[in-house]
Amino acid sequence: MYGKIERIHFVGIGGIGMSGIAEVLLNLGYKVSGSDLRKSEITERLEQLGGEIHLGHTGSNVERADVVVISSAVHDDNPEVIEARERLIPVIPRAEMLAELMRMKYGIAIAGTHGKTTTTSMVATILATGGIDPTIVIGGRLNSIGTNARLGQGKFLVAEADESDGSFLKLSPTIAVVTNIDADHLDFYSGIEEIKDTFVEFINKIPFYGLAVLCLDNGNVADIIPLVKKRFTTYGLTAQADFRATEIRHEGFTTSFVAHYKGQKLGEISFNMPGAHNVLNALATIAVATELDMRFEDIQAGFKSFGGVGRRFQVKGEVNGIMVVDDYGHHPTEIKATLAAAKGGWDRRLVVVFQPHRYTRTKELFEEFVKAFYDADILILTDIYPAGEQPIEGVTAEALSARIKRHGQREVTFVADRNKVCDHLLSIVKEGDIVLTLGAGNILQAGEQLVEKLREAP
């Protein structure tokens, strides 16, 4: 960045997407400040790295800032945004600051409705194993490094590209991965056709020497391939994909398969993360690593060292034969994939606790949610996590629970108060169960409470 920018302020610095950029900037030597409504492990880590953290949002927090960075969750009526604009301090979206970091490196941007965080984490891990030493900015905690960001010494930056508000169009990556395209964020997009058009625009921003890595198994991605004007490769389980997986096996947490490139066998890949959807994420990673001329044996070694990502089928504990797992899945497609992973890896009763995320998403995808839980033996729903949204009349978790029952799901219970979910679980769980908390809100706390209570039990 131009030398006169010294102090950068983040509104909502504790968010997983904001904190990663802040950490990289701190490591680059910039003075970073930020505000959030509450303390967390994330804000404490940033303080330890030299960040100046304020609790609460007040105009005085931005007095010394040269630029103010906001996420899509921060609105124009935020007092820090108002103060910054009155002082003529530039206010920019998170994606613009990420684009600035990407401008300093060759960018590898992972886009798609689902699988971004896991795929970004896989790419970061495998490239590090190959000595490429990338800078990484991830929307989740990479277990192997204990954080969601790292400043590397290599030429590449690996980051998630967030399509939720179209801001990923600010990025100009060298390699663009599209894991899938699905109907989501319909409070911003008019429908699936606009979403597809936006992804086409994103892909075609790569330079002539760049590469698009596209999932051929996803129908919406396949639809846009004729519109792609840049060099691309494909991956998937279909025989037409350039990078393909065969002989897929799932056993507990271990997933393995044989990788092929254009009909030629590359070798076996094995990693500790369950689910067929993660085979696709791994294939995307292999495509990126191959483009960067990594040896296949280094790719194999990287997958063996992959330790997973926070809130992606993350085991919170196993007590008395009851395994408690948390997952960020909050879209019907993600939910079905996660439940299938649990059923495919273990022959155990599956108790699912789901907290819907946002009223708008629940409304737009209501019928898809109704049919997303058939792999759950027992389903518990709790009230919608609003994520700053106002309620929509008739859109409730209780109504969703009732509709799911009417569609043939036998064991469905609605527990309005999330704080009472743990007590309900204690009354029904038994040895051999997998308890899976699902959602992008705070439902993971119910699973953590359950682990504590089970450990305290005589």
UniProtKB/Swiss-Prot annotation:
Protein localization: Cytoplasm
Enzyme Commission designation: 6.3.2.8
Keywords: ATP-binding, Cell cycle, Cell division, Cell shape, Cell wall biogenesis/degradation, Cytoplasm, Ligase, Nucleotide-binding, Peptidoglycan synthesis
Any single GO CC term annotated in Swiss-Prot or TrEMBL for this entry: cytoplasm
Molecular function per GO: ATP binding; UDP-N-acetylmuramate-L-alanine ligase activity
Residue ranges the record marks as coiled coil: none
SUPFAM superfamilies hit by this protein: MurCD N-terminal domain (SSF51984), MurD-like peptide ligases, catalytic domain (SSF53623), MurD-like peptide ligases, peptide-binding domain (SSF53244)
Major location (coarse): cytoplasm
Membrane spanning stretches: none
Pfam families documented for this protein: Mur_ligase, Mur_ligase_C, Mur_ligase_M
Binding site for ATP: G112, T113, H114, G115, K116, T117, T118
Catalyses which reaction(s): UDP-N-acetyl-alpha-D-muramate + L-alanine + ATP = UDP-N-acetyl-alpha-D-muramoyl-L-alanine + ADP + phosphate + H(+)
GO biological process: cell division; cell wall organization; peptidoglycan biosynthetic process; regulation of cell shape
Homology family: Belongs to the MurCDEF family.
Function: Cell wall formation.
Protein name per Swiss-Prot or TrEMBL: UDP-N-acetylmuramate--L-alanine ligase
Gene designation per UniProt: murC
